[in-house]
Amino acid sequence: MDSEAEPPQEKKKPNSCPSFLSLPEEILVNCLARIPKSYYPKLSLVCKSFCSLILSMELYVERLYLGTHEDVLHVCLQLPDRRLPSWFSLWTKPDQTLTNDIGKKKKSTRNTLLVPIPSSYSPRVPMFIGEIGSELYAISKHNTPSSVMWVRDKTSIYAWRKAPSMTVARANVFAYVINGKIYVMGGCAADESKYWAEVFDPKTQTWKPLTDPGAELRVSSIIGMAVSEGKIYVKNSYVKDYVYDPEEDKWDVVASSFMIERKCEIENVLYRFSRQSCSWYDTKHKEWRDIKGLATLNRRRRSSILEVAKYGDKVLILWEIFAKPFYQNKSIWCAVIALEKRKIDEIWGKVKWASIVLTVPRSYVFLRCEVKPV
């Protein structure tokens, strides 16, 4: 062997780039908050750290702070094989052209789906967030009973603190702000007759029970609630529906037809959706007028509207039909409609997309839906 031969040179290792995960958590959260939510399911598969951050409350708060949050539809259903209600959120597949599937043989592209909560698609059940003056109040709608209410000043994203607790622990609660007070109903044991419904006054920082609506409402499942002209209308799983008047602290039975027509307000225009028509209220002539351009939607959608919601500057509607061929299941349809005022007395609608978003057993119960920033 030649002693003069040069020893073999060690191969130089390429400079490894610093790991993204080596960055401080605050920076990671800030980066993730700038990415559209539709990409989160794939990102959560990268590693456990990403999955943990995507499910974290810190990311939710950061998206609100940066203004990158998106309006997301949340739906609550009672499924026959589940003891507790199940929450779902609407997920849109990224970089896809959404289509109108009404009248088509292929009923779903699966580009829009209702996915279970919690999951990488949507980490948590939506919260009630009510605004009173300069403060925001939050109450969880999770299936785990809790009496906690949170409050923070609107100018400080991170400074949530505990507000006075509700008198009883509630799960999947209904809550509304009316005339500067927070009204909560249900979510507790049916025998909690005194505190089945209560109201919080921010001025006195106290909770006060409302009049007992009676056992029939307390033991039933609430499947709809609406506020109109300062009154709370409650639709339950029985034949009767109820209305509560905060001014008189009084419950009354109301005609069920009030809850059949679903309404929402967009840019100071009230819209109404029923089994066979879509209309808007002309305040000048004090009459309801048909929304033009939606004849195909009205003709194909011959079933009851489940819910209507404001979806940004558009309107979102949900309805159900029996699924062929054996009709053992139901298909939940979702459509997003853009609205345009063309003349003084004309409003036109255009279906931006419509598709089946979930198939469920026919015996399921639709409880409610909400559009929340996430």
From Swiss-Prot:
Pfam families in UniProt: F-box, Kelch_FKB95
Kelch repeat segments: 135-180, 181-227, 231-278, 280-308
PROSITE patterns found in the cross-reference section: FBOX
Domain annotation F-box: ranges: 17-63
InterPro entries referenced in this protein's UniProt entry, alphabetically: F-box-like_dom_sf (IPR036047), F-box/kelch-repeat_ARATH (IPR050354), F-box_dom (IPR001810), Kelch-typ_b-propeller (IPR015915)
Domain of life: Eukaryota
Repeat recorded as keyword: yes
Record-given protein name: Putative F-box/kelch-repeat protein At4g39756
Species: Arabidopsis thaliana
Lineage: Eukaryota, Viridiplantae, Streptophyta, Embryophyta, Tracheophyta
